[in-house]
Amino acid sequence: MKTPKLETSRLYLQPLQAEDALQIQQVFPQWEIVRYLAAGFPWPFPQDGASRYVNQIALPASEKGTAWYWTIRRKEEPAVIIGHICLSDEQDNNRGFWLVPEWQRRGYMTEACRIVTDFWFNSLNREVLRAPKASGNDASKKISLHAGMRLIQTGKKQYIEGELDSELWEITREEWNRQSRG
């Protein structure tokens, strides 16, 4: 299934496009955004990092139908990218996101996660959503808790910041739909 446009009360989630790379390159390479990303992301972020990510990783995965990528934009400024969220068929890593620091702690990512999680379960018909995170990433944990996810595994993992305690969070379609209706 192609990545659809999604909308919440305050946000537009637009399917990622090649032309988004320029804006992403300008806002993404900030320590507060990258520190808890998996160690595979290049850091320091190269000048063509966003272009390579969008054109060599994200868009090909979207074309294959194994991942879905959106830019996050406020309705008040729909031309400005404030974050990114993706879903993937990758084992134990189904959802990832980042938000520009100045827009954090306003509920935007909770809102974006809610609509893409519903898409995962009720449009893509997946049975379970799993999201890994660094144990110290309290904001991400709060989003998972708010969504009704539960911690299912702990361990160590390499992040850009280094080797950190890591957690794997999960929610099933049945759990999601039960709480979403309730």
Say what each PLM segment does.
Residues 1-35, 69-182:
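Acyl-donor (CoA/ACP) binding surface of acyl/acetyltransferases
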Residues 18, 45-47, 63, 104:
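A generic alpha-helix propensity feature with a strong bias for hydrophobic helices
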Residues 28, 37, 61-63:
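Hydrophobic residues in alpha-helical segments
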Residues 34-56:
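Conserved GNAT-fold acetyl-CoA-binding loop/helix
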Residues 42, 63-65, 162-164:
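Short coil/turn motifs at beta-sheet boundaries
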Residues 42-46, 68, 136:
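Short, conserved alpha-helical segments within structured domains
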Residues 55-71:
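A short helix-loop-beta-strand connector motif used in the catalytic cores of GNAT acetyltransferases and
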